[in-house]
Amino acid sequence: MNNRVHQGHFARKRFGQNFLNDQFVIDSIVSAIHPVPGEAVVEIGPGLGALTEPVAARMDHMTVIELDRDLAARLASHPQLKDKLTIHQQDAMKVNFSELSEQAGQPLRVFGNLPYNISTPLMFHLFSYTDAIRDMHFMLQKEVVNRLVAGPNSKTYGRLTVMAQYYCNVIPVLEVPPTAFTPAPKVDSAVVRLIPHVQMPHPVGDVRMLSRITTQAFNQRRKTVRNSLGDLFTSEQLIELGIDPILRAENISVAQYCKLANWLSAQSTPQK
């Protein structure tokens, strides 16, 4: 038997398709999302509808974004779902979530079993729309969830950590074994909840500066920040900002990265 075939659909590797089939896990995720009628719920990558069906059962309407043409057509003809779904057959990386929120007249509740091959860039795409999002629940590779929730001074702490925690409160929800999927992935999975901050704990004037600094620091994470960020800050400036120049990227907190970004923005702004 071909283990890439599930419910008559052949899982496409290029789309990173692994279909959830464990009812306990499905029920646990739906309980964590806790959808309520009237909310603007958006699912990314509904696939064969393992999560779509129980969520839609609690809703009058929901929106789904599915890249696979065959799966989108299958959902459109699903007897229990077709009248409840607005289906966008497109790449979620190209979706304007602010427009979806404006159309709904409220912030979005986004969830999905994300294809692991695009999960990180997709989250960065979503971070740019956090003003339009109430919360997000995602099934991800466990290693990615570990990075999202990491603290400073750990090997899993990186640019994704800093940017995710800048935008959101990040909460691990559930660990999921490979046996919960068809075909079974070669890695463990986990569900995470991301709640965009209503008030930023560490406001940054220009988030592009934060992105630039974190990219530069973590691209050279074995170097001290005196070296990795040497073209942006002198050792004396780092010390004045409360950062030891001999620390490495993983030793700098989210708050400290935000402080660096704001200082650099201030230096780049022409004085009146």
Swiss-Prot record:
Keywords: Cytoplasm, Methyltransferase, RNA-binding, rRNA processing, S-adenosyl-L-methionine, Transferase. The keyword Membrane does not apply. One of its GO terms (cellular component) is cytosol. Its EC number is 2.1.1.182. GO terms for molecular function: 16S rRNA (adenine(1518)-N(6)/adenine(1519)-N(6))-dimethyltransferase activity; RNA binding; rRNA (adenine-N6,N6-)-dimethyltransferase activity. S-adenosyl-L-methionine binds at N18, L20, G45, E66, D91, N113. It is found in: Cytoplasm. It is an enzyme of class 2 (transferase). Pfam families: RrnaAD (PF00398). It catalyses: adenosine(1518)/adenosine(1519) in 16S rRNA + 4 S-adenosyl-L-methionine = N(6)-dimethyladenosine(1518)/N(6)-dimethyladenosine(1519) in 16S rRNA + 4 S-adenosyl-L-homocysteine + 4 H(+). Gene3D superfamilies: Ribosomal RNA adenine dimethylase-like, domain 2, Vaccinia Virus protein VP39. The keyword Iron-sulfur does not apply. PANTHER family: DIMETHYLADENOSINE TRANSFERASE, DIMETHYLADENOSINE TRANSFERASE-RELATED. Belongs to the class I-like SAM-binding methyltransferase superfamily. rRNA adenine N(6)-methyltransferase family. RsmA subfamily. Specifically dimethylates two adjacent adenosines (A1518 and A1519) in the loop of a conserved hairpin near the 3'-end of 16S rRNA in the 30S particle. May play a critical role in biogenesis of 30S subunits. HAMAP family: 16SrRNA_methyltr_A (MF_00607). This is Ribosomal RNA small subunit methyltransferase A. The gene is rsmA.
